[in-house]
Amino acid sequence: MNKVSFLTLGCKVNQYETEAMQELFKKRGYEICNENDICDVYVINTCTVTNLSDRKSRQFISRAKKLNKDAILAVVGCYSQVAPDEISAIEDVDVIIGTKNRARIVELCEESKKSNLKFNIVSELTKDCGFDVLSIENQESKTRAYIKIQEGCNMFCTYCIIPYARGPIKSRPIDDIYEEAVKLANNGYKEVIITGIHVGSYGLDLGNDTRLIDVIEKLSTIENLDRIRLSSIEAGIISKDFLIRLKNCKKVCEHFHLSLQSGCDKILKLMNRRYTTDMYRKKVRMIKEIFPNVALTTDIIVGFPGENDEDFQETLNFVKEIGFSKIHVFKYSKRKGTPAFDFKEQVDGNVKKFRSNELILLAKDMTTEFLKKELSEKHEVLFEENINGNRLVGYTRNYIRFSAPYNEDMKNKVVYCNGISVEGEEIFGLASKIKI
């Protein structure tokens, strides 16, 4: 039996696409192995969000061929898309695929092995490319599964290379999304997480009225699916109508990852984020009015070019006002090929580090406060992971990591639980009743 291993860099979308490519290899009889095993094929699914990501991609490309000099080495993904010539210059690479045509990966790897030829099928991404369908029936996690519903982004934030790596928005047909979700539910998955590059733009390219909310409403009709969770969305999609329709879909989780990036209007404008803090504030109020028990998580970039101490303080103040349950903090990293790369007033590295540490400390305090507030609530927990044989860990509907004493009967079940204590960034508690 031929063996293949995958190494994946980057986001949840990349992880989804890796698992989809793994299924393609499995269907051709390949054994999926560890990245450090001796294999016949190595696939590096690359990331290009920062220059560091590019460097890591090159390092892993170099390492893979050293494991087996006779293996086929395929490099796919975002770095391949934006820098195919750089990858072509690496002698050991046999197959180069960008962010489309990944369904051909098995065919190209086998043809390369047979003919001793190299293949580079990276081509320009246009709005006419269509959605590159990669679907999954089984994922590594047996409780929660990702479903990719769209590709690409038209927003062009000044710090972001992704619109160039992923191309214009391309929406997956709604019936295809539904069919994949049905298969996942039939295979025992209790929760699906809707993901994509810019999820809120779903449907804008279809030439009809189908939008993200229509996808959610259709998935909510799947009888043996208990939960639907949204990945990252933007403030612009939030409206009263959208939220009311979400609320009526009883399976939608009370958790919104609402990307912020900065709490300073000056910086938001420099980033080309297309909203103000006042608009964001109003959207949050709408959410909390309709989903009182909601968890709000976000991303923030510190040290963006032009950000001074007063601007950063505005971000700190705004973060406190909103009351996030969790914040992912990133230090701005220059990315060649983006407008911000050439911006003046680049922030010193030590200043970025200081601001990052300060925001991380604030974020930890906010997470603790949120968890303490949630201790008195009764939670539905989908248990999925066994920790050291004595605890099960899972997530509540509002995305709190929750642990309880191990009980085999609760694994991959939704269980009503009561919290006892806050332990770091999770709640420990006891089960009261299995829901499903």
Q: Which stretches of residues belong to each language-model region?
A:
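Conserved SAM/AdoMet-binding glycine-rich loop
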Residues: L73-A74, V82-A83, I87, N186-D309, ...
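Hydrophobic, well-ordered secondary-structure elements that form the walls
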Residues: L258, D299, V319, I327, ...
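Short, solvent-exposed loop/turn segments at secondary-structure boundaries
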Residues: S53-R55, P168-D175, G203-D209, L270-R273, ...
